[in-house]
Structure formats: C-alpha cells, structure tokens
Regions:
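Serine-dependent carboxylesterase/thioesterase catalytic core
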Residues: 60-154
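C-terminal catalytic-base region of ester-bond hydrolases, centering on the histidine
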Residues: 130, 140-240
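Structured segments of extracytoplasmic/periplasmic soluble domains
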Residues: 29-33, 66-70, 93-96, 100, ...
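Active-site catalytic motif of lipid deacylating hydrolases and related acyltransferases
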Residues: 1-78
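Structural recognition of the beta-strand scaffold that forms the well-ordered cores
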Residues: 3-6, 39-43, 79-81, 106-109, ...
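Short secondary-structure boundary/capping segments
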Residues: 17-25, 54-58, 95-96, 121-127, ...
Length: 240
C-alpha cells in the first residue's frame, strides 16, 4: 500500500473556480491517476494565505493526519507532492513524519516556495528531512524572470548540502502544470505586480510545462515501480 498526499499551489478564493484552473495541475494529475493506495488532495492557499480553511499550515496538517491514519508499519510507503506553497507544506509534512518514525519514499516538488510564516523554522525554510529517499524537484530558471519577487524553498538538505533539482524555462505557473494562456498575440507573459513581464511567451510556457511533466512523471513512475517491488518483499520499504 502506497499512500499519496498532494498539496497544490496558490490560487483564487472560490473553490469551484480554483478546481477549474487547477484541473490539470501536476499534483492534481498525480492524485487523479493514483491507484497504488490511499490518496489525498488539498487545494492550495489564496494569495494572502488568509482563508482559514485553506491555510498552508492546515493543508499540511490534514495531509500529515491522512498519512498517519493510513500508515501500517512494514506494509506502507509514502509519496508526497506539492506545488508552490504546497511544496513548502509537504516539505513540512516530511519533517513531521520523521518525528513519528515514518519515512517518505518520494518527495515531489514543483517550484516550491515558502511565502508564509506558518511553515518552516523562524525566518528560515525547513530543510529536506533525511528520511526522504527520492527527491523529484523541478525549479524555474532565473532567466525566465518569473516571480522574481520570491525565491524557492527546500534548496537545502538536512545536512546542509544542496538539494538536487532540475531547472526549466517556464513561469512559476508552468512549473506546476498551470501555464499561462495570455497573451495570445505571442508577446511575453505579464504576471502583474510586483513582477510584471517575464521572458516567457505562452508557447514557451506550454513547452516548459510539458518538459516538466515528462521529466518528473518518468521519475515518479520509476520510484513507484521500485517501491512496489520492494513493498512486495517480506522486509518492505518501511524496514529499509
């Protein structure tokens, strides 16, 4: 049994509109296609993170509790996926699970950012727990000039070493599977204040998003197949 917990990215207040926008986000696709065991999906916070029910912290907490409620020692494994602030949420979940003696088989991060005081250590991002076996981390290139007002989180492991990641030329939205559809005239995408124009066109953003999906999903599938094989053995992944 392989448990999946996903937390998606920042979006609009209205849940129906949010669901439509994020219908094909990478976290959502992983959730919808998950057949290896119990699965849970949390929408992301609103921009100001002021919608109580969807606080980044509460999304992380619900994910954590879901894993705990389904975990069976020696029989289970955990895959966590997060986009944008959802990435910060699942990084935190991995740390909380470590404190319960539960490892994370695969941590999937789509351009994670920590723009809330609810996650991480005081004034410092939470590092990746040493109980995470496989990390799939997709990060936007600086040359894309997307969301320059904030950087990424999860860039350091628990031992201080740099987290392995792969960069893609796309916007922050494209990295999460929600690439921009405007402007249709072929100009550079304008993300609005405070960042404004990127160096990415709509076509580039779609191409970048496709590249992220191909790269990350291939790695997730590899990790999933390996985990299923090990889980079928008497000393499954929880014991390794």
């Amino acid at each position: 049994m392989i448990i999946f917990g996903g937390v998606d990215g920042t979006g609009v207040w209205n849940n129906d509109k949010y669901a439509k926008i994020f219908e094909y986000s990478f976290v959502r696709i992983l959730y919808n296609s998950w057949t290896a065991g119990p699965r849970n999906y949390e929408r992301g916070p609103v921009t100001a993170d002021n919608k109580l029910s969807d606080y980044t912290y509460f999304s992380a907490l619900r994910t954590y509790r879901y894993v705990l409620s389904n975990w069976k020692a020696s029989e289970s494994a955990v895959f966590l996926a997060g986009y944008s602030r959802g990435g910060a949420a699942v990084i935190e979940v991995a740390k909380w699970l470590k404190n319960k003696g539960i490892p994370v088989e695969c941590l999937i991060l789509f351009d994670p950012v920590d723009r809330t005081g609810q996650m991480g250590l005081p004034w410092k991002d939470t590092p990746i727990a040493d109980t995470v076996k496989t990390i799939v981390y997709a990060k936007r290139m600086k040359s894309a000039k997307s969301r320059e007002s904030f950087g990424n989180c999860g860039l350091r492991m628990w031992n201080g070493e740099r987290t392995p990641y792969k960069e893609f030329f796309a916007t922050h939205g494209g990295l999460g599977g929600v690439p921009w559809t405007e402007p249709k005239a072929g100009g550079f995408i304008d993300e609005g204040p405070p960042d404004f124009k990127t160096r990415v066109t709509v076509a580039m953003d779609r191409a970048g998003a496709n590249a992220v999906q191909k790269w990350s999903f291939d790695l997730v599938m590899d990790a999933l197949l390996e985990c299923e094989e090990r889980l079928s053995e008497p000393d499954g992944p929880a014991k390794q």
